[in-house]
């Protein structure tokens, strides 16, 4: 029977001394309080340069899990793309040039689509603006933007500024206009809710939508009048002089999101010949280009293909003939598998995976416990049966409920998690295992913006906890640690040598 080392990632569980609408601090958490008091712990960085993002940029789940799993700072697509723009190499990118050459040669339209937002989590509006300028410089005649609106990694009603900037730029360059708008709830689903994706797809491709407006700003105003914030704007087509824009054969479409998980579904709708998740009247004969690789199975051009890290935690465990389990509910399953393995879809030898379905509710404040009880049942079973040397799990609650902006529901989510932690702690200590508890970024630690007094639905840049629970004596050996130091710490407690590719340092020193 194996003594399990368990890594618990509490998604969106940041640390803040402030109790102002801090769902984590103000919730009733007897287990967490006792763990924080009785076991070795520290705070580590999960944002900014320490995780390969631009200075001051909040972390996110994808970035967090890549850094944790790789055991080194992994420079993120946002940083890579910013660098290409800064060094003026963005416009020379082969995939981008091919998409632009296609429309120039065929006198067709260039469609840009993506999250029009300064959020920097799934996209950045500056990349879209740069793309529009490059299209103009290279002689493209018509550019149409299909804008997905945020309100999740940005304040819920903040899209007006982004739309105005885009309208001004397109007007100044006399190049085109925003041809459709959709809330990210529809265009960027990641949980197989294809009815949502269908609405966004039809608005973009077929100019077929429930609403038609004369401008993107008008569409936004009408949505607010229906009490639908940015995230939930129903896909709307924009007409100019009575004309609606469709995606036609020979057009080029460039998807400007750089994060994969919420870009996959609609990309498959554009590119899969045998797509069957909703009816399509035709298969598009277009140049479809994505800024980064969303899925290796997609038939498209990729502007910034992934760099494959070697000797990630999962790979090192496999090479040392260790068994491992990855477990999460649907919302965070890609994070403990694909992202944690450094962008590899395939399982390692000796790696098992358990996917617990997320509840089918419109928003998770309606069910703050989400699927945490089921995740915990499976975890406790796995610890008790001693099958695995290492288990990595993710609890989605503090992030997904945090994103709703519902403070009371977020506190309920934290209290559910506290009960789950009690069960895990008991199981680990009973079987003489090791448990590390951390987070990939903050969220529920600030549910209301103290400056604006409005709901805060985005991530925070706060530090996150890193705690050791077990019978070994441990001391903090590293001040100012970061997410990339977690994998070396796990290898240390498991007495496995750290490979040179892992540049992180061990956070705790354990008495042998």
UniProtKB/Swiss-Prot annotation:
Keywords tagged on the record: Glycolysis, Isomerase, Manganese, Metal-binding
A Pfam family of this chain: Metalloenzyme
Leading EC class: isomerase
GO terms, biological process: glucose catabolic process; glycolytic process
Annotated positions binding Mn(2+) 1: 399, 403, 459
NCBIfam families in the cross-refs: pgm_bpd_ind
This protein's name: 2,3-bisphosphoglycerate-independent phosphoglycerate mutase
Organism expressing this protein natively: Francisella philomiragia subsp. philomiragia (strain ATCC 25017 / CCUG 19701 / FSC 153 / O#319-036)
Lineage: Bacteria, Pseudomonadati, Pseudomonadota, Gammaproteobacteria, Thiotrichales
């Amino acid at each position: 029977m194996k003594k399990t080392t368990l890594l618990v990632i509490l998604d969106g569980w940041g640390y803040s001394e402030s109790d102002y609408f801090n769902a984590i601090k103000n919730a009733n958490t007897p287990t967490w309080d006792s763990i924080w008091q009785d076991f070795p712990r520290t705070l580590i960085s999960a944002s900014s340069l320490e995780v390969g993002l631009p200075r001051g940029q909040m972390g996110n789940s994808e970035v967090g899990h890549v850094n944790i799993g790789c055991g080194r700072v992994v420079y993120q697509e946002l940083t890579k793309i910013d660098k290409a723009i800064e060094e003026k190499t963005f416009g020379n990118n082969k995939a981008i040039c091919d998409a632009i050459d296609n429309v120039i040669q065929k006198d067709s339209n260039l469609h840009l689509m993506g999250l029009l937002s300064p959020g920097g989590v799934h996209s950045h509006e500056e990349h879209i603006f740069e793309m529009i300028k490059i299209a103009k410089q290279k002689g493209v005649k018509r550019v149409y933007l299909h804008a997905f609106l945020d309100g999740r990694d940005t304040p819920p009603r903040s899209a007006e500024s982004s739309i105005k900037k885009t309208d001004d730029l397109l007007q100044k360059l006399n190049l085109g206009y925003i041809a459709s708008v959709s809330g990210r709830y529809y265009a960027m689903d990641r949980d197989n809710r294809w009815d949502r994706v269908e609405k966004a797809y039809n608005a973009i491709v077929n100019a077929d939508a429930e609403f038609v407006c004369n401008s993107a700003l008008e569409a936004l105003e009408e949505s607010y009048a229906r009490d639908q914030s940015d995230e939930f704007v129903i896909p709307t087509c924009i007409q100019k002089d009575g004309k609606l824009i469709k995606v036609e054969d020979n057009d080029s479409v460039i998807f400007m999101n750089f994060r994969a998980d919420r870009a996959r579904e609609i990309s498959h709708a554009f590119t899969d010949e045998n797509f069957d998740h909703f009816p399509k009247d035709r298969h598009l004969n277009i140049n479809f280009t994505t800024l980064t690789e969303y899925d290796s199975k997609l038939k498209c051009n990729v502007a910034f293909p992934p760099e494959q890290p070697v000797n990630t935690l999962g790979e090192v465990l496999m090479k040392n003939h260790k068994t491992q389990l990855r477990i999460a509910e649907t919302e965070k399953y890609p994070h403990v598998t694909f992202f944690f393995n450094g962008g590899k879809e395939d399982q390692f030898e000796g790696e098992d995976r358990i996917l617990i379905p997320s509840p089918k509710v419109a928003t998770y404040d309606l069910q703050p416990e989400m699927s945490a009880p089921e995740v915990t049942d499976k975890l406790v079973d796995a610890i008790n049966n001693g099958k695995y040397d290492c288990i990595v799990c993710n609890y989605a609650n503090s992030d997904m409920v945090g994103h709703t902006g519902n403070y009371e529901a977020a506190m309920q989510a934290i209290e559910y998690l506290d009960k789950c932690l009690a069960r895990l702690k008991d199981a680990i200590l009973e079987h003489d295992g090791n448990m590390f508890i951390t987070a990939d970024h903050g969220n529920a630690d600030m549910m209301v913006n103290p400056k604006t007094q409005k709901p805060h639905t985005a991530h925070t840049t706060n530090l996150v906890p890193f705690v050791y629970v077990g019978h070994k004596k441990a001391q903090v050996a590293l001040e100012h640690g970061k997410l990339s130091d977690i994998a070396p710490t796990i290898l240390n407690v498991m007495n496995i040598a750290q490979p040179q590719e892992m540049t992180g340092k061990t956070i705790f020193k354990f008495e042998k």
